[in-house]
């Protein structure tokens, strides 16, 4: 018992921090002598050594938690220092941090630096080791394949020479007979290696552009230097040439392949793709040689000179080997150009004969002029703009098409200029001003008659051209159509135009604006000589107005009153607006203005409905807030007083000052509720006289 009285026990909470991590806290019971003045670090370490081993004492530095100026700090400890408990709780809290040995860290750094320097200073030694290992493996594989005993002995000797870097060159030269045996014993290696080389190669076009040759890619084995002198000699000598696979030679032709059929299929697919690319991007004249091209170039007309100059880039960038198919195509192109590039007068005669001949091939498209016939007719057939009846085949190219179009456009411009000159010679400009718009030309049907083709053919063409060119209005007015009929009848006496009744309006009443913007009907009749009248329906590209109904003969315009919207109520060219502000509408903060639109009398009449001025009643909040709080005024003031008392943290107001008492029943009410109560409040005698129930304020006996 006396021994136990000399020692005390305390619970210690400790936490280890090692390897950058913090362990969960642990708690232990530590005994210490009572005469030493308190718990010391030595006592804690002895207890931890018994529990967790001897290494924990020298591996950590210890500190305990204490209070310092109202905060907690960690106080470092040595073995003889006393650990003080926390103020208030009386707990012992320790923390152990892992020690860092600077000597070991320096030794590790020196070792790593030395290893890095050695790696950087001797890269050639590593390469030598790698190459020697690979060569020894190759030598073992190749020479191990020899079947006879004598060859096997020679192979072993050669392997030894390869391993030894100081071998003599004379001993290597004495083994010249080995190459034949090695080449015979390893026939499959060459085929496999060639297949790999061709599959790795990049196929490209040669300079002649007629064959595709594989271009071997550079690999690591071909770039790697060989440091061993013996291996260099072995590679260069003809005796040991079978050890290393020779580079695959370039193929003589794209069809002769010395390897598997699978590679042949892939190579043919690439060749087909490249040939298609050449034929797609090159012109028909590109494959002609220079001699044939100069001979043909002298025979071609001068108009085609620009076309061949544009093709010079494509001709020079491709091969110059001629082929019979390209020569035939060149002849066809030359024939086509000779037929296309005829004189302008002959081209106009061909177009005129086709136009008036009655055939469906040369019919003009609706509302086209004589000038536009050369450009509008080919669009329906998707052919060349100068296509004639000759049965030759057209050949197109994607890259040369632009130059052909320029030549054809220049011819079309020349033809237009000549036709316009003939028109100016026939009619003076004064008479051209009275002709209608191109919409009237839609209603004239071309009827094939002998009189029109022989005598009045030129006049009809001239009239149609002038009518289409000299029109000044997009839609002619119906009252001007009779003058157009007179002009047409004067120029062509055999032509009679019968216009339907819906075109003109004989009624004098009604404003002139009702006839504006009414397009012509889509049906007209044309009579020429004694021939029967033909009816032709033309679909106009512009939409019909609301008054016209599709599929009916009723072509009279129906006046529909348009619905007024903010957009259509104001015309496009609106007159200046007149703004009038009403001062009566201004009330307080709101400044409202009534704007009335007053257009001129010439424009469409628009009378907008008068709008009522909006008058807003202004509430003077500032004056209301400044009013004093009078008890018994309103319920709002009573609630406001309660709210202000709550927000200002003031004592609640005296309700006896706010509430009012009824003089009859002596009950208290809010000011506004009291007035309602007084309407139905009666004395007790009155209540007993008219009701079986007495007033609640009267006590029954």
From Swiss-Prot:
Its cofactor is Zn(2+). It holds the Pfam family zf-C2HC_2. Residues 8-101 are annotated as: DIX-like oligomerization domain. The keyword tRNA processing does not apply. Keywords: Cell cycle, Cell division, Cell membrane, Developmental protein, Membrane, Metal-binding, Zinc, Zinc-finger. Residues 238-262, 300-329, 366-389, 538-575 are annotated as: Disordered. GO terms for cellular component: plasma membrane. PROSITE patterns: ZF_C2HC_C3H (PS52027). It comes from the Eukaryota. Residues 306-319 have a biased composition (Basic and acidic residues). GO terms for biological process: cell division; plant organ morphogenesis; protein polymerization; regulation of cell division; specification of plant organ axis polarity. It is a peripheral membrane protein. Gene3D superfamilies: Classic Zinc Finger. Belongs to the SOSEKI family. Homodimer. Forms long polymer filaments with other SOKs proteins polymers crucial for polar localization and biological activity. 'Soseki' means cornerstone in Japanese. SOSEKI proteins locally interpret global polarity cues and can influence cell division orientation to coordinate cell polarization relative to body axes. The DIX-like oligomerization domain is required for polymerization, edge localization and biological activity. This is Protein SOSEKI 1. The lineage of its organism: Eukaryota, Viridiplantae, Streptophyta, Embryophyta, Bryophyta.
């Amino acid at each position: 018992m006396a021994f136990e009285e000399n020692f005390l026990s305390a619970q210690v909470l400790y936490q280890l921090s090692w390897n950058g991590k913090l362990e969960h806290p642990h708690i232990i019971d530590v005994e210490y002598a009572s005469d030493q003045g308190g718990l010391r670090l030595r006592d804690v370490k002895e207890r931890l050594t018994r529990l967790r081993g001897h290494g924990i004492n020298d591996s950590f530095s210890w500190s305990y938690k204490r209070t310092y100026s109202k905060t907690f700090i960690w106080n470092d400890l040595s073995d003889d220092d006393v650990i003080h408990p926390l103020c208030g709780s009386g707990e012992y809290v320790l923390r152990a941090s892992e020690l860092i040995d600077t000597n070991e860290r320096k030794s590790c750094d020196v070792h790593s630096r030395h290893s890095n320097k050695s790696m950087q200073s001797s890269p050639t030694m590593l390469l030598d080791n790698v190459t020697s290992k690979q060569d020894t493996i190759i030598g073992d594989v190749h020479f191990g394949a020899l079947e006879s005993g004598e060859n096997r002995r020679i192979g072993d000797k050669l392997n030894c020479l390869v391993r030894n870097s100081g071998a003599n060159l004379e001993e290597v030269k004495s083994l010249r007979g080995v190459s034949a045996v090695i080449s015979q014993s390893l026939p499959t290696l060459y085929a496999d290696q060639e297949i790999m080389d061709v599959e790795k190669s990049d196929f490209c076009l040669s300079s002649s552009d007629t064959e595709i040759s594989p271009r071997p890619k550079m690999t690591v084995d071909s770039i790697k230097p060989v440091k061993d002198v013996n291996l260099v000699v072995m590679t260069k000598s003809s005796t040991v040439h079978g050890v290393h696979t020779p580079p695959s030679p370039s193929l003589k032709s794209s069809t002769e392949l010395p390897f598997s059929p699978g590679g042949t299929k892939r190579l043919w697919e690439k060749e087909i793709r490249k040939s298609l690319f050449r034929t797609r991007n090159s012109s028909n004249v590109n494959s002609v040689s220079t001699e044939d091209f100069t001979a043909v170039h002298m025979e071609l007309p001068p108009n085609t000179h620009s076309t061949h100059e544009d093709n010079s880039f494509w001709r020079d960038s491709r091969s110059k080997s001629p082929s019979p198919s390209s020569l035939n195509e060149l002849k066809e192109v030359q024939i086509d150009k000779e037929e296309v590039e005829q004189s302008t007068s002959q081209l106009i005669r061909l177009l005129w004969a086709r136009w008036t001949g009655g055939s469906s091939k040369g019919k003009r498209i609706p509302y086209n002029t004589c000038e536009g016939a050369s450009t509008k007719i080919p669009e329906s057939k998707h052919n060349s703009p100068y296509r004639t009846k000759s049965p030759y085949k057209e050949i197109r190219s994607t890259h040369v098409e632009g130059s052909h179009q320029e030549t054809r456009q220049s011819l079309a411009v020349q033809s237009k200029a000549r036709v316009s000159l003939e028109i100016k010679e026939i009619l003076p400009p004064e008479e051209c001003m009275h002709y209608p718009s191109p919409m009237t030309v839609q209603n004239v049907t071309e009827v094939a008659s002998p009189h029109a083709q022989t005598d009045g053919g030129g006049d009809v063409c001239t009239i149609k051209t002038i009518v289409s060119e000299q029109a000044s209005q997009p839609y002619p007015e119906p009252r001007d159509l009779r003058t157009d009929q007179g002009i047409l009848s004067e120029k062509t006496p055999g032509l009679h135009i019968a216009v339907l009744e819906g075109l003109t309006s004989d009624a004098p009443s009604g404003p002139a604006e009702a006839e504006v913007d009414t397009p012509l009907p889509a049906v007209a009749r044309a009579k020429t000589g004694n021939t029967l009248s033909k009816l032709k329906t033309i679909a106009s590209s512009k939409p019909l107005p609301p008054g016209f109904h599709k599929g009916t003969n009723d072509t009279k315009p129906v006046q529909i009153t348009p619905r007024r919207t903010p957009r259509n109520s104001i015309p496009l060219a609106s007159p200046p607006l007149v703004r009038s502000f009403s001062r009566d509408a201004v009330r307080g903060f709101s400044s409202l203005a009534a704007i009335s639109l007053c257009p001129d009398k010439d424009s469409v009449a628009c009378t907008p409905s008068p709008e009522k001025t909006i008058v807003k009643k202004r509430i003077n909040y500032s004056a209301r807030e400044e009013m004093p709080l009078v008890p018994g005024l309103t319920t709002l003031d009573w609630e406001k007083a309660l709210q202000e008392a709550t927000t200002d943290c003031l004592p609640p107001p005296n309700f006896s000052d706010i509430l009012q008492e009824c003089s009859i029943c002596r009950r208290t009410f809010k000011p506004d509720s009291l007035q309602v109560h007084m309407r139905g409040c009666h004395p007790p005698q009155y209540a007993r006289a008219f009701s079986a129930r007495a007033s609640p304020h009267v006590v029954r006996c």
